[in-house]
């Protein structure tokens, strides 16, 4: 069970939140504990960081959870209701490090601060408790601090809404990254729900509790685990959704934002409301919600996404993934944009080719590209700095990040101004040029070179930016010199060379002269008006002046006033920056776009990639293709070069469907690598990247499916074979004539004849029904005879050489079928005992002899093709005629029925079924 949703009702000996909120608990609590209980009751699903002096303390179940997650000591603090109070704490100065660990573990944290001075509390009574309140709700999807965020990954909060209308419910997703302001919406369907969620990779998914507990969707949320956080269904009310979004953006209508479905509005409204709740009504600088069409991106199902290791390997590491192999970006924004593009490849050839044009332009100008990348290297993460400033969490270094980013943008704009650019890069250049130059000039004139982390430390406004601030700093830092100057002035004015300005705790600053020299200050009207007598000593007299008194006050208040001026300047600069939020975000996206294009251009040159031809045809012709990840790994290891192989799944002349290659060959021959590399080349091409091939022509793929590798799902009671069949079923049910399917070893997890039969039928289905482009690797050599009847099916094999009883894997793909799998040779290489290998050879010889007496080629004549078998089954069903229930259903018109009539009809149908 998700511990986030169950934080208020954990079992065990520790008092729960409901126990603490009881009358008995409140009546027996100390004033401090009563305050804690009240605040905790308002935040039951969060760990409460309760500020006490220099520590954040946690009590009761929160302490138990936090001590376990953080690996810190669990101690005790007195008793409550007859039970000891578990307690642990973390120092305030190190709180971010502990928050990072808790957020990474999926916890939500409410940060409770002291909101008044202890002296103020004492005015209400000697036993009054200092007021405390929650100033921040920290959740995995709503963090903005650099320490808690990965610079190269987006940090999405996602909302899932479901609207029941008609026979099928409507689903929609809204996702927000408050650290960058991205806000997007998309409709989805139950069948692709998990795939769409995993494509976005949210850190936190909020959804109605009614949806969370829907048994039909349980498998989805089991996969997501603690990422899914149920919320009250009222948060997703579509009736009030448009009004809530309009209020957030301060507009009267959303018509200017575009057209959205009810489900999309419900999801967007829930996301916005959750952001406001967690930010305590502060509003991050969110962009206008952008609507994504499901058809605009390549559909990649969850199993395929995992098997192809796009962003992470199966072990969860970024190293070894496709993303890691392609990433040559210089900025955090560029790294995030590349990851987003790779996870959501396009299906529109025009947009794909715009991206490819940008890479080609930069690849053709290597020196220019190097200069652009050098300038990009100096661009900080402007969107995240902007978000912190908008939320009131920013510091001087965030202003500095905006300043440095705008400087880098100006340098890049100058580089691009006279260059030959693609349409995409021209648009990016224009967005950069639209940055307000006066804002950069103001930042340059205001900010110091060295900036502190916290604004309360001061020192971030440069000298000369404010005359009053310079004066206050001079008084604060150079008070002795100022006093000495004033003393010299008074000496000259009075002619008393022994005049001194001194200081004590009683009089403060004062002028002291000997009694014999005081005449010029006491005997004339001008002297008495100028010098005010303060004290007479035995041998001296002390005076002050209005000027000295004012100077004393200024010196005493100079530090406070200097900081106040800096804070006022900071707030003014923040307002100016936030007012230009849209221009800054547009420029930041432009910089990221340039960074991605330049990085992929460098990659193409470095790895000898080529520009693919991408269009709306059904072509899939790869000449000299390579696996991008494996090839780079071999180069790093200084091993043998990667063996390139072609692949042509284009429709044969006159045929409408795509071609299928049936790939046979030995274990360790490279079948799986070949399958994966072609899928990755398709993804790279539709991402808008050059590809590892000598040439490539790809008609856009709408859906990509793979069934590669073996794994079980013990938690859900699924064997390896069951998982294989579920994934294969999804492919056969969803693949279209524009899809690309790669299947590896279908049917290997069961008895030989069962597996062969399933693989046989699957190949026929792909050819006759799906009509997709496909690669089908198998050790069932009997399947190769299908090429005689299936016109778009071709046999291909991984080539090997035998030498003195050893097998040499050439890793080359060629036409034809393998006559054996060389499994025994691989077993010998793996170190199986010689006796086992010898026995295996004997058994294999007998089995092969038996197989020659009943060759598989006879099956092709004995078995009808897939479509024939399907037609027979359909004919058998048709001959029986429709049932009474089917006839009754056809006669019903739900739109013309009252609720009562519909209920009566339902009972009648149920009764008819019971009588059968």
From Swiss-Prot:
MF GO annotations: ATP binding; ATP-dependent DNA damage sensor activity; damaged DNA binding; mismatched DNA binding
SMART domains in UniProt: MUTSac, MUTSd
InterPro entries given in the database record: DNA_mismatch_repair_MutS, DNA_mismatch_repair_MutS-lik_N, DNA_mismatch_repair_MutS/MSH, DNA_mismatch_repair_MutS_C, DNA_mismatch_repair_MutS_clamp, DNA_mismatch_repair_MutS_core, DNA_mismatch_repair_MutS_N, DNA_mismatch_repair_MutS_sf
GO cellular component, one term: cytosol
SUPFAM superfamilies associated with the record: DNA repair protein MutS, domain I, DNA repair protein MutS, domain II, DNA repair protein MutS, domain III, P-loop containing nucleoside triphosphate hydrolases
Gene3D superfamilies in the cross-refs: 1.10.1420.10, 6.10.140.430, DNA repair protein MutS, domain I, MutS, connector domain, P-loop containing nucleotide triphosphate hydrolases
Family (UniProt): Belongs to the DNA mismatch repair MutS family.
Protein name: DNA mismatch repair protein MutS
